[in-house]
A protein has these predicted regions:
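C-terminal motif of bacterial Sec signal peptides marking the signal peptidase cleavage site
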Residues: 18-20
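N-terminal domain-start motif of subtilase-like serine proteases
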Residues: 83-111, 134-140, 276-278, 373-374
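Extracellular S/T/G-rich loop segment that most often corresponds to the catalytic His/Ser-adjacent loop
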Residues: 115, 237-240, 245-337, 341
Length: 384
């Protein structure tokens, strides 16, 4: 999943000679210039910003990603409180912590994830990591930001939906080649789904995999898509639910991620907002969820485990469906705890029947954008 563009030394020299400048004499970027470049990118994870004056950047500030290693200056945008944002982002929201307090934690339910490389020792999940294997180029590089994020959103001890679920994790690639030569191919993910299905047959009672989470989507004609869909069908036939991004699958089509006011309470629907990546489509009339058919879970403004260290965290202003998928997998793990025989079809029906409408006002117009999942009501409908 890591796409590195590598140039051979001879090619580098040839390009330099053609440019008429010989070897590069470009001076290193000054620290302040480097910091300002990071500000423009919006990714401030690990950045040292102490020499900057960030006042006046209120509009941009709430789109920044940062982590517990970001070093902030004294001069911050007015009202911007990164520590508070990070702490609020740890709350999975929708009343889940109240359910955790009642013992509904996904205890003993297996969640399998296929994603990028994972640091195995993070405090959010390390003590419940039952199986971890890397394949292909995922085994050649360091842990990514994506892997620990999706794992912790699903089952993290403090940030996760199912904080006592068990983790089975495969790190693999979504294709072959590197850089411009990268070619997307889902065949390896198909093999991984089959690996997990086979692994599940060997697991002791009380530790079985009930759901596979893959933060990936595809089109029918993509290389390997047919093989992956066949593997998913085999997993489902073996009693394992599979959650990914697939609007052509009736079990997955309804799910969508939503946002939240920066300092809003993650447990109050009044503080929910349209998702950052699809908000404009709501106002333009292109959004497909205005009829209330979509089921919404938290996606933006989330804090997750970081690969920077076993106790480090990263805050993501905008999440994308990559963060919504493990959230749904975690919800299903809770359902499996309260009703071990539950199917994903039953879970989906209960989610639909108990979800609550949400809308947003803009320029005097109310825009409905779906229904927020109500975990307590969902689980009660299943017999919790």
């Amino acid at each position: 999943m890591k796409n590195r563009k590598l140039l051979r030394p001879a090619l580098c020299l040839l390009l330099a000679l053609l440019a008429g400048c010989g070897p590069s004499r470009e001076e290193p970027m000054e620290p302040e210039a480097e910091s300002r470049a990071l500000l423009s990118s919006g990714d401030l994870r690990g950045a040292d910003l102490r020499e900057l004056d960030l006042t006046g950047l209120e509009e941009a500030a709430y789109r920044w990603d940062f982590d517990t290693r970001t070093l902030w200056p004294e001069e911050l945008p007015e009202g911007f409180d990164p520590a508070r944002l990070l702490e609020l982002g740890k709350d999975p929201g929708l009343g889940l912590r109240a359910l955790h307090g009642r013992g509904i934690t996904g205890r003993g339910v297996g969640i399998a994830i296929i994603d990028q490389a994972l640091p195995a020792d993070h405090q959010e999940y390390g003590d419940r990591l039952r199986f971890y294997q890397e394949y292909h180029t995922a085994a050649q590089g360091p842990a990514s930001a994506h892997g620990p994020a999706v794992a912790s959103i699903a089952l993290g001890k403090t940030v996760g939906v199912a904080p006592e679920a068990l983790l089975y994790f495969l790190a693999d690639d979504l294709g072959t080649g590197e850089g411009a030569a990268f070619s997307r191919d889902l065949s390896w993910y198909a093999e991984d789904v089959d690996r997990l299905t086979a692994l599940n047959e060997t697991l002791p009672e009380g530790e079985s995999i009930r759901v596979i989470s893959m933060s990936v989507g595809w089109m029918p004609g993509d290389p390997g898509a047919e093989a992956l869909e066949a593997a998913i069908a085999r997993a489902r036939a073996a009693g394992i639910a599979v959650v990914c991004v697939n609007s052509r699958d009736p079990l997955l089509e309804p799910w969508m991620g939503m946002g939240r006011r920066p300092y809003g309470d993650p447990n109050r629907l009044e503080d929910c907002l349209p998702g950052a990546f699809w908000e404009e489509s709501l106002y333009s009339g292109e959004y497909r969820g205005t009829d209330g058919s979509l089921l919404l879970v938290p996606m933006d403004g989330r804090t997750a485990a970081s690969p920077a260290g076993g106790a480090e965290y990263a805050y993501f202003a905008g999440g994308g469906m990559s963060w919504a998928v493990p959230y749904v997998a975690g919800l299903y793990a809770l359902a499996c705890q309260v009703k071990p025989e539950v199917t994903f079809e039953e879970f989906l029906a209960a989610a639909r029947s108990t979800a609550r409408p949400v809308s947003v006002w803009r320029d005097g117009v109310e825009y409905p954008y779906g229904k927020a999942v109500d975990p307590a009501a969902l689980l009660e409908a299943l017999g919790a």
